Amino acid sequence: MVSKIMNKKYEKGLSLIESAMVLALAATVTAGVMFYYQSASDSNKSQNAISEVMSATSAINGLYIGQTSYSGLDSTILLNTSAIPDNYKDTTNKKITNPFGGELNVGPANNNTAFGYYLTLTRLDKAACVSLATLNLGTSAKGYGVNISGENNITSFGNSADQAAKSTAITPAEAATACKNTDSTNKVTYFMK
């Protein structure tokens, strides 16, 4: 009788191997949750950036309707509208931020008629760059660019997104090649009519 009680006493609880298996399972579940959370967070940031671009475009088009040019267009004009959500307005530095921690820069074309104005999203990681570079703005867009400089001085649009402005929407394959910076220094530019 005493031995039965002792055996039951020793059978209670988990063995070391069982405890290790439970901890391993918990770690796997936690890692999976973190992975999917990060993926959902990145997707949400991309959607917010797209909404920000669309809102800025709509506001600019509304403000400049009937005007002959976009002369004087810059971020401070958009800061004074309701088109940009307050959490992306840096009124102290007169900048518009984007969901990835960079900026949304806007400006007119410099004395050329290749396009009307541009919008550039900066400090994008590779995944965000690919996602945002493939955004097709339809007939409102004159061209697209990835990691190009001197946006306001572009005078023509080519057929490739590699180091140049492109006249048509950027394909995912082109974006994967053009978004080459792995240190969150990519930028995507939309050239609007």
Swiss-Prot record:
Pfam families in UniProt: Bundlin
Superkingdom of origin organism: Bacteria
Residues recorded as bearing N-methylleucine in the entry: L14
Keywords assigned: Disulfide bond, Fimbrium, Membrane, Methylation, Plasmid, Transmembrane, Transmembrane helix
Maturation propeptide residues: 1-13
Organism: Escherichia coli O127:H6 (strain E2348/69 / EPEC)
Annotated knockout phenotype: Deletion mutants cause significantly less diarrhea in volonteers.
Subunit (UniProt): 10 to 100 laterally aligned filaments or bundle-forming pili coalesce into rope-like bundles. These form linkages between the bacteria within the enteropathogenic E.coli (EPEC) microcolonies that are attached to epithelial cells.
Stretches that traverse the bilayer: 14-35
Disulfide bonds: C129-C179
Name the record gives this protein: Major structural subunit of bundle-forming pilus
